[in-house]
Design a protein with these regions (language model features):
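Single conserved hydrophobic/aromatic residue that forms the stacking wall/gate
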Residues: 176-193
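N-terminal nicking endonuclease/strand-transfer module with a His-rich metal-binding environment
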Residues: 1-178
Length: 193
């Protein structure tokens, strides 16, 4: 079964998230790893897609939306939310999970749970400890750009409106990881099976 981790960020540089996902980083210091000439080292294997960016770069699309709605302008504002879905290392050999399938699952999870948000979805085949766990990073702009239907974890009407901010509530995290009403043995987390 997959696990979910949430990190919110006040960093106004949306490009930093993409840089982290595309280039090697020291997993302990979080600093980029450089080659002998001082250049960033691209990650060897990843899948990357965006959602609701209108064909623009994720960072540019987020900055345009923030300006349009006059949000995320203050230093203390949470600018983005980073969700990491980590699959069990056994999901590869036992259930046939591949990086491509994990990317599909991440895109579906993002579309279902973060509708109306600009998103960057990136899948890596392994972590820094070489445990073999495929993991999906989902980075969303905290600002919703489209009105969406009221979802079970939302507790205010404003949570559905374009121009309003995403809130990672306890109810949302419980919903994401709770058993599915369709099948109590499974969670709403993406399943590799």
């Amino acid at each position: 079964m997959a696990t979910l981790k949430h990190i919110n960020s006040k960093n106004a540089d949306y490009g930093a998230a993409e840089q982290y996902l595309l280039f090697e980083h020291d997993e302990f210091t979080m600093k980029p790893v450089l080659d002998e000439t001082g250049r960033l080292i691209p990650r060897e294997d990843y899948r990357l897609s965006t959602l609701n960016c209108g064909g623009e770069d994720f960072a540019v699309a987020c900055m345009r939306a923030n300006l349009r709605y006059e949000k995320n302008q203050r230093r203390e504002d949470v600018k983005s939310h980073h969700y990491i879905i980590s699959f069990d290392p056994r999901d590869g050999p036992d259930n046939g999970l591949t990086v491509d399938r994990a990317q599909e699952l991440g895109e579906k999870f993002c579309a279902e749970h973060f509708p109306g948000h600009q998103a960057l979805i990136c899948t890596h085949p392994d972590g820094h400890n070489h445990s073999g766990n495929i993991h999906v990073h989902i980075v969303i702009n905290s600002l919703r750009i489209e009105e969406v239907p009221f979802l079970p974890y939302m507790d205010r009407p404003a949570d559905t409106k374009a121009g309003c901010k995403h809130r990672c509530t306890d109810a949302a995290c419980l919903l994401y990881t709770s058993p599915s009403p369709r099948d109590p043995k499974t969670s709403r987390m993406p399943s590799s099976a």
